[in-house]
From Swiss-Prot:
This is Eukaryotic translation initiation factor 6. PANTHER family: TRANSLATION INITIATION FACTOR 6. Monomer. Associates with the 60S ribosomal subunit. The gene is tif6. SUPFAM superfamilies: Pentein. Belongs to the eIF-6 family. It comes from Aspergillus oryzae (strain ATCC 42149 / RIB 40) (Yellow koji mold). Binds to the 60S ribosomal subunit and prevents its association with the 40S ribosomal subunit to form the 80S initiation complex in the cytoplasm. Is also involved in ribosome biogenesis. Associates with pre-60S subunits in the nucleus and is involved in its nuclear export.
């Protein structure tokens, strides 16, 4: 399912939230409707942690994570770290990273199996990403942009990349990630798809400005109509039911 939301007049949902298959981290703020969207879809399924990171609300840009782990910058306070540890499932590893490129959400794009990272991240950071998130790590650019986390949104089902990504690059990335990719936009033409939305295997949340066409592309490439949270990892439904859902 794909839904639209706004965080205090901002459509950049991926700036203020981080969504995975085992938890969600959402910024603390005055946006009740923003929380209610997440709570309506996730409440009984995965924990939603209301948090700040390094005293700021841009939790989606400062963190990177998947079902197995969460990476936070070294500027994260001890209290914030403890709050995350108390709220997130015990199976999720939480690790502070000392890294010059500290907006981890901008420089790391990952699902539960693979991470695409900024070419200039330190070697030690690359090892921590592989260890904590349990993924294969590749240094990559998206349409010649080094900010992989900003210009790509990825789940275990599919991904959306910067609208100017060439067909050749899309094919290359798709075979690397082993998921279908599409070049697209969110929030009425924004190329910053990673910061404009959050997605896991059964839910996408995008900005209120996202058009119906953009939303249908998102639902299609991430295969969001196919299974609810209970069905994650159980394989997808057969093709007939997908075809029927278009009528």
């Amino acid at each position: 399912m794909a839904v639209r939301a706004q965080f205090e007049n901002s459509n950049e949902v991926g700036v203020f939230a981080r969504l995975t298959n085992s938890y969600a981290v959402v910024a603390i703020g005055a946006s009740e409707n923003f929380y209610s969207v997440f709570e309506a879809e996730l409440q009984d399924v995965i924990p939603i942690c209301h948090a700040t990171i390094a005293g700021t609300r841009i939790v989606g840009r400062l963190t990177a994570g998947n079902r197995k782990g969460l990476l936070v910058p070294t500027t994260t306070t001890d209290q914030e770290l403890q709050h995350l540890r108390n709220t997130l499932p015990d199976s999720v590893k939480i690790q502070r990273i000392e890294e010059r490129l500290s907006a981890l959400g901008n420089v790391i794009c990952c699902n539960d199996h693979v991470a695409l990272i900024h070419p200039d991240l330190e070697r030690e950071t690359e090892e921590i990403i592989a260890d904590v998130l349990g993924v294969e790590v590749f240094r990559q650019t998206i349409a010649d942009n080094v900010l992989t986390g900003s210009y790509m949104a990825l789940s275990n089902q599919g991904g959306i990349v910067h609208p100017k990504t060439s067909i050749r690059d899309q094919d290359e990335l798709s075979s690397l990630l082993q998921v279908p990719l599409v070049a697209g936009s969110v929030n009425r033409g924004s190329a910053v798809v990673g910061a404009g939305m959050v997605v896991n295997d059964w839910l996408a949340v995008t900005g209120l400005d996202t058009t119906a066409t953009e939303l249908s592309v998102i639902e299609s490439v991430f295969r969001l109509g196919e299974m609810g949270p209970r069905g994650v990892g159980m394989g997808s439904t057969n093709k007939e039911s997908i075809v029927e859902s278009f009528y």
